[in-house]
Amino acid sequence: NDYDSDPIAQIVEWGRQGVVLDATVNLSASPYHANKSGIRVAVARSAAASLNHPFLLANQVGGNDDLLFDGRSVIAWPNGTAVIAPAWKEGILIADLSSPEGCVWIGDGELSILGSDEEIEDEEDDLLDAIIIGLSDYCRKSGISKIVLGLSGGIDSALAACVASA
């Protein structure tokens, strides 16, 4: 826990005081790093189990200055089932709180549904996607429409060409 307060504990306490909630929504801007999606799913599952109702974690997507956000929003149920939105894609996740199978993704890519004993696997392409999204969003937000590449033939040039062509 990176915070002085514990919002999940506070919501649990409200429940003890008679407050009834159908779900909890967390609007997040959690920066990307390798294996972050597994941590995010574990946090959402833990929150849903503690709260005894669905926990929805909506995460930002795209590049913002020197930070990258992979999206991958999560809906977790108290039984550990989780629905995960696609990485690096903007879209709308429509939640059906009664059934993971009823959730709908409007956008590119597809939802993943994980059973309570399944872990999310970070895709091997995540790092490349992060670099491409970061460079693309930086150029778009900075008004850069053309880039000149100086290529020497080394591995770094091959990587630069690969990113530029994506």
Q: Which sequence ranges carry the predicted segments?
A:
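Enzyme catalytic cores with a strong preference for nitrogen-chemistry domains
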Residues: 1-150, 158-166
